[in-house]
């Protein structure tokens, strides 16, 4: 996996030494070839993507403690924590060894990856993330993605666990006051938006066969903590910018991820730019500033599937989100 990352901060604040607001954009799987092809696809050879107009560009070498080819978990964790770790691990230290989850057979049919096998002690320690450090400074926080909210890239901002596939435990780390909550999030993340997945809903053999065997409804728990829950474009547009938001969008029905841009129904499912704009509107209410992570998560999925057109369209959608953000900061 190759990732190109753009971090946006007000240039005035940069000159002063510390940014009030930070928007961290991550195009998952989006390497130089994909960027070049997307530019030509949208604007022609002489055109420019919005991301290409930014004043600074850098390249990185990606490898982990145990592999030359990394996955999204240790790479995003490196961005968020500054720590080089092992493949599959999320925002833990170099002493952490990945231990995959196993199926929960207490229900029929069984639910894969529902049992977290990470030892409670003796397998490394968590490392603070940029999002957590921003919360500690009194800033608002947000996570927006076109992938599942519990997928490796978004999870690295708010969760600490020895294996990225333990998504049932990753989800509960985001729910304030509940069992398994990550206390470094204080009262919780202000904005959460991404593809829906069963990791947030209770198990039901007929309706949510991949739901939570522990029976918890994490969306209901978040609503009890003051979050507004939305699931389509209309409810997102109607949501107040004065409160907290959990958006889980299920139109794609594709492993919990949102639709590819080419397949998205613009009347029902929000674009990444629309989600980014809404997140900024909400987070901007905090006078101390905010930290927002925005992932174009399906670029990588299209490239894995050797589907060039979908990859290019999702890269352009990601670039549109950057343009939308620049229009608001």
What are these regions (language model features)?
Residues 16, 285-287, 325-329:
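Secondary-structure transition/capping motifs at alpha-helix termini
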Residues 16-244, 251, 266, 315-319:
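N-terminal catalytic scaffold of extracellular/periplasmic and nuclease hydrolases
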Residues 152-159, 253-264, 288-289, 293-326:
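Active-site His/acidic residue clusters
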Residues 184, 232, 287-293, 329:
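Flexible, glycine/charged-enriched surface loops at secondary-structure junctions
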Residues 278-282, 321-328:
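Generic, well-ordered alpha-helical scaffold segments in large soluble proteins
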Residues 1-2:
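Bacterial N-terminal signal peptides that target proteins for export
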Residues 10-12:
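N-terminal signal peptide c-region/cleavage motif recognized by signal peptidases
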Residues 249, 259-288, 299-300:
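Accessory "access/gating" subregions that flank catalytic or transport cores
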């Amino acid at each position: 996996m190759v990732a190109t990352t753009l971090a946006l901060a007000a240039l005035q604040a940069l000159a002063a030494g510390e940014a009030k607001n930070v928007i961290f954009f991550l195009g998952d799987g989006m390497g130089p070839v994909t960027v070049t092809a997307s530019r030509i696809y949208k604007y022609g050879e002489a055109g420019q993507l919005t991301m290409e107009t930014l004043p600074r560009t850098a390249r990185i070498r990606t490898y982990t403690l145990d592999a030359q080819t990394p996955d999204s978990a240790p790479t995003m964790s490196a961005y968020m924590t500054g720590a080089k770790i092992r493949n599959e691990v999320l925002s833990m230290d170099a002493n952490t060894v990945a231990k995959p989850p196993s199926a929960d057979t207490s229900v029929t049919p069984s639910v894969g990856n529902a049992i977290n096998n990470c030892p409670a002690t003796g397998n490394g320690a968590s490392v603070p993330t940029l999002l957590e450090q921003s919360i500690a400074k009194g800033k608002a926080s947000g996570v927006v993605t076109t992938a599942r909210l519990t997928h490796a890239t978004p999870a690295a901002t708010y969760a600490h666990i020895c294996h990225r596939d333990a998504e049932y435990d990753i989800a509960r780390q985001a729910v304030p006051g509940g069992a398994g909550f990550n206390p470094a999030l204080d009262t919780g993340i202000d904005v959460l938006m991404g593809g829906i997945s069963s990791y947030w809903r209770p198990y039901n053999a007929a309706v949510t066969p991949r739901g939570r065997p522990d029976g918890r409804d994490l969306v209901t728990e978040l609503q009890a903590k003051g979050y507004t829950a939305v699931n389509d474009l209309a409810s997102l547009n109607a949501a107040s910018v004065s409160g907290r938001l959990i958006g889980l969008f299920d139109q794609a029905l594709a492993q919990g991820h949102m639709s590819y841009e080419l397949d998205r129904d613009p009347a029902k499912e929000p674009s990444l730019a629309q989600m980014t704009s809404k997140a900024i509107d909400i987070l901007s209410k905090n006078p101390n500033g905010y930290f927002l992570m925005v992932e174009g998560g399906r670029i990588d999925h299209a490239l894995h599937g050797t589907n060039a057109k979908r990859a290019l369209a999702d890269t352009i959608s990601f670039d549109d989100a950057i343009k939308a953000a620049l229009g608001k900061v």
